[in-house]
């Protein structure tokens, strides 16, 4: 089945509805999102391809998804390292960080050196709600992501991309094209500009929300929390 994509306004509204109509807490949604991300990494980069996963986290919910994904990856047998230069102030992010430290998962301040010791990168810096200019240190980090030959999995949006117009015309992120992208809940318009493998995660949307937004999403198989959705099947706007 073809997957429609959500406009910027509907994507933000749907997130609110998940917590009001759907009665989900932020903790639950972040846990489910991070679990989906970890399953994508396992699918496209199994441990046999290298266990060293560098997770670059921003200060918001996208970064929180990355922290959750790192915990699951550790339990799968990977060796994650966290780059988290500006930790979010929400108590939830602090607990997620503590959970990782309890597993002796290292945090690094040296992103360029960490890349040299990694096999795969999870881009959890900025999500679909990103707007404005990119501030330090993330401008340099995104430029480093553009230059690396390592495979990258981006969460909901390649960092710096606009939800509707895709990559910026210039500056950091203009040439960022990750190999893998996982859209959370439903694809966003930016997937039209994406050229890699595209996955969907969000096996928790209630029938009521499905109906409200007229979502047309592919079925998940078995116990999978993700499903691969070719870009050409994500074209009709909601």
Curated annotation (Swiss-Prot):
The keyword Chloroplast does not apply. It is found in: Cytoplasm; Mitochondrion. It catalyses: (6R)-NADHX = (6S)-NADHX; (6R)-NADPHX = (6S)-NADPHX. It holds the Pfam family YjeF_N. K(+) binds at residues 62, 123, 159. It comes from the Eukaryota. Binds 1 potassium ion per subunit. GO terms for molecular function: metal ion binding; NAD(P)HX epimerase activity; nucleotide binding. GO terms for cellular component: mitochondrion. Residues 11-217 form the YjeF N-terminal domain. Its EC number is 5.1.99.6. Its cofactor is K(+). (6S)-NADPHX binds at residues 61-65, 127-133, 156. Its main location: cytoplasm. Catalyzes the epimerization of the S- and R-forms of NAD(P)HX, a damaged form of NAD(P)H that is a result of enzymatic or heat-dependent hydration. This is a prerequisite for the S-specific NAD(P)H-hydrate dehydratase to allow the repair of both epimers of NAD(P)HX. Belongs to the NnrE/AIBP family. This is NAD(P)H-hydrate epimerase.
């Amino acid at each position: 089945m073809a997957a429609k994509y959500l406009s910027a306004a509907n994507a933000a509204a749907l997130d609110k509805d998940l917590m009001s109509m759907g009665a989900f807490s932020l903790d639950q949604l972040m846990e489910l999102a991070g679990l989906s991300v970890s399953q994508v990494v396992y699918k496209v980069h199994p441990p046999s391809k290298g266990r060293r996963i560098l997770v670059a986290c921003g200060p918001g919910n996208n970064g929180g998804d990355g922290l959750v994904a790192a915990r699951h990856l550790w339990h799968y047998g990977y060796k994650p390292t966290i780059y988290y230069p500006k930790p979010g102030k929400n108590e939830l992010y602090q607990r997620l960080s503590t959970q990782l430290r309890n597993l002796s998962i290292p945090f690094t301040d040296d992103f360029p050196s960490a890349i040299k010791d990694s096999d795969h990168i999870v881009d959890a810096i900025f999500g679909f709600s990103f707007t404005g200019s990119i501030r330090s240190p993330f401008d340099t980090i995104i430029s480093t992501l553009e230059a690396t030959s390592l495979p990258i999995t981006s969460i909901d949006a390649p960092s710096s991309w606009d939800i509707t117009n895709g990559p910026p015309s210039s500056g950091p992120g203009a040439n960022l094209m990750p190999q893998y992208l996982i859209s959370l809940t439903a694809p966003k318009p930016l997937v039209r500009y994406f050229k890699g493998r595209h996955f969907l995660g969000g096996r928790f949307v209630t029938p009521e929300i499905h109906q409200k937004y007229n979502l047309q999403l592919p079925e998940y198989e078995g116990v999978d929390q993700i499903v691969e959705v070719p870009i050409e099947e994500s074209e009709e706007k909601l």
